[in-house]
Amino acid sequence: ETKQISVVAINRNTMTQINVYDTEGNFDHTGVGQICLAHGYGDGMEESCEREKKAVSNLLYSLPISGYAAINMGAVPMINDAVGGVTVPRMTYQDGKIEYGKDQTLMGEDAYRFVHYRGNDFDAATYRLEKQKVYLKALMTKMLASVKANPASIVNLYQSVSPYMVTDVDVSEVTY
């Protein structure tokens, strides 16, 4: 209706109730931990995503999560280049503040470095998360324009990304 894209980003260091498993993968207990650990208690694939989905739902007061898509960072250059590059502002982080500069169009490995680099400052995860939100919003805008111009492009992109992705959302749900 508003034709706007909103991104809800959850910092990997957010503390919430997560299920804890033993070394054999058996449920041990529920405790408070970093939300990113929920994924680590799984197999790195569907099991990890289901456990992360549960932790996110717990964080959001049992809000049902209808689906997930975990995409390996190695897919970023391919996705980025498939839409002709993504334009984002230059971002610098200093003294706890993000400063925005001139726009830059990221291609290939530059896109990967933009969304992946975290640094080692105390609040580096927050800075990276902000960069990822900016990037994702710009990417989604480009993808929507691409789909409007050629509706089949979303199917092609989905198929290209599939080897890098674990999801419970099938291509028909993406296209309709």
What are the functions of these language-model segments?
Residues 1-176:
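Non-catalytic, solvent-exposed segments at the cell envelope interface
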